[in-house]
A protein has these predicted regions:
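Intrinsic-disorder-associated, low-complexity terminal segments enriched in Asp/Asn/His/Tyr and depleted
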Residues: 8-11, 17
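Extended beta-strand/beta-hairpin segments
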Residues: 16-90, 98-187
């Protein structure tokens, strides 16, 4: 059973939540994230020409699986590897999902399924520079109770406001959630 759709909302970079206390500049914690990005595409000849080298690289962090990266195929990359644009869209989706699940659990809403098909839009300028113009998150969430539908849908607004990654980008991050009601898996 589908819940009523939520109005389309967007996080606007630099927007201030009118219901939030004014930001006083204080920080409660600082977190440091360190990764190694290593180019593996020299092929022995290095960057002797634009087409002479592979864009392949590896992304590593202690104790984690290696991520095989490249540029987008449109920029001579390997389409079988993750590109930075996909990783940015995935990071926005992951951050939103993790905040959403936290908020749902805190609100007593039982989520039994969460899937997202996010889409990022990037424009490229004649000189080769470019930027993202927006990311659209399209989460499909299943909750166990019909009475939780409205609140489950509005939690996306809170998740968007709290997501560290969405708060850090300079383009709109919109979300168009779909919430349905389903039964818990009894296995």
């Amino acid at each position: 059973m589908a819940c009523p759709p939520a109005p389309n909302r967007a996080h606007t970079p630099g927007a201030i939540d009118p219901g939030a206390a004014p930001y006083d500049g204080s920080v409660s914690a600082t977190h440091i994230y360190e990764v190694l990005v290593e180019w593996t595409g020299s092929g022995g000849s290095g960057t002797t020409s634009y087409r002479s080298y592979s864009r392949d690289h590896e992304i590593r962090s202690a104790g984690k699986q290696v991520i095989a990266g490249s540029s987008d195929a449109a920029f001579l990359g390997d389409p079988d590897r993750w590109n930075p644009e996909e990783l940015l869209v995935a990071a926005l989706s992951q951050c939103h999902m993790l905040w959403y699940l936290h908020l749902a659990a805190s609100a007593g809403i039982v989520v039994i399924s969460y899937k997202d098909l996010p889409v990022g839009t990037m424009t490229e300028l004649p000189d080769g520079a470019g930027q993202f113009t927006e990311v659209l998150l399209r989460p499909s969430v299943t909750v166990t109770e019909q009475v939780a539908c409205a609140r489950a849908t509005t939690l996306h607004d809170d998740a968007e406001r709290l997501c560290f990654i969405a708060r850090s980008v300079n383009f709109p991050v919109r979300h168009e959630p779909v919430t349905t009601v389903g039964a818990k898996d009894s296995t």
